[in-house]
């Protein structure tokens, strides 16, 4: 995505994070470059405010600053807060319980993180989503062009990729290769999940396939 980024931990204990990168695509297309950044990160940059400058400018749902109406290639919003994501997923499932068809499928809520200047994906080469599968629910087997990486953000369940199935819990990572059937069953409960559901963080290279008009998906819906 041609975006500078740095790694540092200002906390007093170790941390771990996931780097969602488009390096495999750049490697295959021989378009990968490496450049050194600055030698030093300023003290101000090492301090994380309660609300960053980007959030104060861009983090207002449905609103954008008139001082910055132009489209930007990647999202200027540097933090997407979990409280907002959690509320959006919970509201989708609540609306479903009220009889509204506002989820991806029964028991499966999902949101996509977007670039507030375009409404499109946060990066031109990477799509980022959060999925919530209600306890006891199972997603329909789906296959798509493009590859995805999932992290179990919360809860537990059993996932099936192709002809293999295994149990997952919070912190687990797994990959779904292109055009490989994938489904997830939530086995979460209040004892292992704050929401009582299986929460899956996903990033994929779908924007690349859509730009090349090579996107395709197929969902196995249950027979009526």
Regions inferred by a protein language model and the residue ranges of each:
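Intrinsically disordered, low-complexity terminal tails and inter-domain linkers enriched
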Residues: 188-195
């Amino acid at each position: 995505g041609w975006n500078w980024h740095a790694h540092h931990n200002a906390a007093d204990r170790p941390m771990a994070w996931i780097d969602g990168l488009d390096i495999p695509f750049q490697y295959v297309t021989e378009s990968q470059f490496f450049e050194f950044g600055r030698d030093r990160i300023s003290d101000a940059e090492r301090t994380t405010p309660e609300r960053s400058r980007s959030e104060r400018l861009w983090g207002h749902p449905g609103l954008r600053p008139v001082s910055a109406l132009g489209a930007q290639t990647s999202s200027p919003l540097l933090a997407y807060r979990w409280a907002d994501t959690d509320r959006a997923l919970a509201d989708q499932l609540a609306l479903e319980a009220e009889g509204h068809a506002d989820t991806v499928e029964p028991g499966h809520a999902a949101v996509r993180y977007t670039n507030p200047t375009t409404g499109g994906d946060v990066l031109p080469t990477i799509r980022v989503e959060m999925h919530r599968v209600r306890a006891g629910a199972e997603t329909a087997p789906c296959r798509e062009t493009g590859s995805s990486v999932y992290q179990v953000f919360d809860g537990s369940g059993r996932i099936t990729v192709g002809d293999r199935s295994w149990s997952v819990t919070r912190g687990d990572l797994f990959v779904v290769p292109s055009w490989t059937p994938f489904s997830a069953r939530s086995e979460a409960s209040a004892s292992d999940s704050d929401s009582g559901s299986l929460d899956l963080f996903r990033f994929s290279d779908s924007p690349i396939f859509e730009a090349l008009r090579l996107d395709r998906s197929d969902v196995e819906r249950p027979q009526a």
